[in-house]
Amino acid sequence: MSADAGPGSGALVLFSGGQDSTTTLAWALDRFERVETLGFDYGQRHRIELDCRVKVRAAMAALNPAWAAKLGEDHTLALDALGAVSDTALTRDVAIEMTEGGLPNTFVPGRNIVFLTFAAALAYRRGLKHIVGGMCETDFSGYPDCRDDTIKALQVALNLGMDRRFVLETPLMWIDKAETWRLAERLGGRALVDLIVEDTHTCYLGERGPRHPWGHGCGTCPACQLRAEGFARYEAARVSE
């Protein structure tokens, strides 16, 4: 958390409706007086997440009256151009596989850079200083735009380019998926964990039918595997305590 988070401060959360962004939304609601959310429609195969995010926002407000009082406007931006220039498994109906460069073909070049740039432009207009994202480089697929160095460099560029002092908050940067589940429990109790399991969406293929202990998804894509492995470690630690 940044040092100047407190009464009167506001935050804009990049909120996709997935596990990580739901946890970061809870984190922001626990810290800031006013919290708005931002989602993106960029032609993703798992576009069902846009439907899930509406349900998750409502469920989080119902879960905690204090959160409901802080939760402000929700924004959605269409970024069709990002999907048009990206030849990836997230925006094309192709099999998920590793590329010669060592990255999975689910990597959408520049996605987080574009997301955070638009988020900063919106935060500028809305008078919000803190921009919160679920980027992480501890337990991730190797995406370069999730790295701490990238986020820090982008914060400098955005502040120079907009003559503001935005703070890019990444509360998940140095924790793994098991710790992300534990953070959700600390923030909202088992009720928030259950909400994340049942209502959030992570699967790259957009599968909502199969129901696993960790939630809905195909169970085989990289996103599902990370979520499942993290949940298994989280549950094992709970049993041993």
Swiss-Prot record:
Protein's job: Catalyzes the ATP-dependent conversion of 7-carboxy-7-deazaguanine (CDG) to 7-cyano-7-deazaguanine (preQ(0)).
EC number: 6.3.4.20
Pathway given in the UniProt record: Purine metabolism; 7-cyano-7-deazaguanine biosynthesis
Listed InterPro entries: QueC (IPR018317), Rossmann-like_a/b/a_fold (IPR014729)
Phylogenetic classification of the source organism: Bacteria, Pseudomonadati, Pseudomonadota, Alphaproteobacteria, Hyphomicrobiales
Cofactor: Zn(2+)
Gene3D superfamilies named among the record's database cross-references: HUPs (3.40.50.620)
A biological process term (GO) from this entry: queuosine biosynthetic process
Cofactor: record remark: Binds 1 zinc ion per subunit.
Top enzyme category: ligase
Family: Belongs to the QueC family.
HAMAP family, A to Z: QueC
The protein, known as: 7-cyano-7-deazaguanine synthase
Reaction equation(s) it catalyzes: 7-carboxy-7-deazaguanine + NH4(+) + ATP = 7-cyano-7-deazaguanine + ADP + phosphate + H2O + H(+)
MF terms in GO: ATP binding; ligase activity, forming carbon-nitrogen bonds; zinc ion binding
Annotated keywords: ATP-binding, Ligase, Metal-binding, Nucleotide-binding, Queuosine biosynthesis, Zinc
Binding residues annotated for Zn(2+), in chain numbering: C203, C218, C221, C224
Record-listed ATP binding positions: F15, S16, G17, G18, Q19, D20, S21, T22, T23, T24, L25
